[in-house]
Amino acid sequence: MLLASAPFTAMAQGQAGIKAENLDKSVRPADDFFTFATGGWQKLNPLPGAFSRFGSFDQLQENNNKRINTILTDLLKKQGKEGTTERKLGDFYKLAMDSVRRNKEGVSPVKPLLNEMENAKSLSDLRALQLKYASFGYGVPMGYSFEADEKNAKMNILLIYQDGLSLGQKEYYLDNDKATTDIRNAFRQFIANMFRLYGFSDAQAEAKRDAVMRYETMLALISKSRTELRDVEANYNKMTLAEFKEKYPNIPLEQLANAEGIKSEYIQTMVVCQPAFLAGVDKLTSTETAEELRARMEWNAILASANYLSDDVRAEYFNFFSKTMRGTKEDYPRWKRATQQVEKQMGEALGRIYCERYFPATSKKRMEDLIKNLEVSLAERIKAQDWMSEATKKAALEKLSTFYVKVGYPNKWKDLSQLTIDPSKSYYENVQTCQKFWAEDAIKEKAGKPVDKDKWLMTPQTVNAYYNPTTNEICFPAGILQYPFFDPKADDAFNYGAIGVVIGHEMTHGFDDQGRHYDKDGNMTDWWTEEDGKNFEARTGKYADFFSAIKVLPDLNANGKLTLGENLADHGGLEVAFNAFEKTPEAKKGKVIMGFTPEQRFFIAYAGVWANNITEAEIRSRVKSDPHSLGEWRVNGALPHINAWYKAFDVKEGDKLFIPENERLKLW
């Protein structure tokens, strides 16, 4: 995956490609290329109050939000025929926009559920409620879903994985630096405040808060870190249902699955991703009291409903998760939150209309041509590596040649005829209906069935891209095929430096520290010779060390192990895209535009993709959780290892970004 506003039409009418106002020519490119290429953009785009990070991605997403909101507003005005997808989109958007109704209802839509939990006095009563609401997982500290079997990638299998941490990462519960401790203390207060807002007394709120904190802290102790979760082989442990019951007798997996509509025959074999975590959960379950389980179930229900109730509840949620954790100053406006929620529940349906209105066929064709050129370039680079044997090269080239390429939008669209949106019910109740629909749909489509390679993992309007190892596919949604990633009016230097590197980035994921463990059919298998595998690990280990040495704040280093895959993909994307660009007629002509050679424009376009402003709190949050390096270091950390960049900008010894050639990292 590649991550984590003026309308594009207006941009396309003006100057194409690189924009002079986005640069800061007072900075030498050899000393700080990020500021040289994006300093002007940073000054022109100060951090908006509703963002903790605002960059080129976000600017484009803002434009998409406005487009999607226009679609929804039009649908609301037209009041389509009852039962049509268009009517459902409009009705759901209206519910999301109706804050007057939500404020009048307060927390009443979720009170029947909380009352059920509060009135369940015994463990058996509470566990019966867990089965009743199995689709929502209240109080269940593990996740499970049907996904491709990584060692038989054509078939889906039940995956069971660690879950249950409200803060996402274990470090928030266990680290003791001041920034983390402050967040943890604020989290404790937030839990109690939320229980009070939902009608519990001070004494109840504090007792339930303590129960939640105790349990989640114990979960943190047995959870793997984000870095440990990157080890694909260590996180694949196949077992039978009988073995699961023997190992984890206190976890009622079969009952939960059956309650959700999953037949036992479909879970006779499964993959347990983190066995030690489940062993810990099994032990915790054996000693848990009714009071503790009730508090956790209620907390899960509260957290899951907070964005769909009255403004005071949403404000409390925002104040902790956005303001405290990320440094955001103000919430998104109501229209934007409403638009995002419609996207979350019916995104593909919106995407179909989006593509009809905004995605030209010419963009799809040009993108497909670029991809073909970069596939040729990557093949050449694989063949040229002196550290790989011919056998491994052959397997790598076979994998590359079988990439399944997706551009723009899916070949088939999801049928939503069975999804019901009922305007007489609350916004929260309709969200629950949607969530249950998608949970049941996933079971119907995946349980006991082959993997559907035509299914997209992102909506067409998403500003991102991805590589999926189990289907060996690269996907570029329509949403990202716009400025500053792609400009049909710009020269090749711009498009190869921007979207070209994105394409190369996703291709390289097929051969990064995770992707290299999967063959051309998507199966996890070791297709490398032993020596080649060792060579790969030795080379990539240097990338991890290099990025871990970067200080992102005076008291905080980057995590090169967590970001390894993305850093490898950035490096590979740059090498592959530049190699392909050099073959273009425009590159060979060497025409100077705006005072820059084609090679210089290539690298400026690349850096422009990562232009951003960011809060300190967001930096700290991303270093803990994000497998991508910060934007500044995707430029200043990546380019000093690209020989062509030195030549393009005459970077020499003594310049701040200079690295001796024998110390530059190289893989592809």
Q: Predicted segment positions?
A:
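Bacterial Sec-dependent N-terminal signal peptides
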Residues: M1-G14
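Short secondary-structure subsegments characteristic of cysteine-rich extracellular domains
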Residues: A50-L72, A205-I222, N495-V501, E599-F603
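Short, solvent-exposed loop/turn elements at domain surfaces
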Residues: W41-N45, L167-G168, P484
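Short, Gly/Pro- and small/polar-rich lid/capping loops
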Residues: Q13-E21
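Noncatalytic, helix-rich "gating/capping" subdomain that lines the substrate-entry/channel surface
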Residues: L75-E368, N373
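Active-site-surrounding "flap" and adjacent substrate/cofactor-binding loops of secreted or lumenal enzymes
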Residues: R28-D31, F36-V100, K104
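Hydrophobic/aromatic-rich, well-ordered segments within soluble, folded domains that form packed cores
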Residues: N22-K43, D177-R196, L564, D570-V576
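Intrinsically disordered, low-complexity linker/terminal regions across diverse proteins
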Residues: Q61, K247-N250, V271-P275, E343-G347, ...
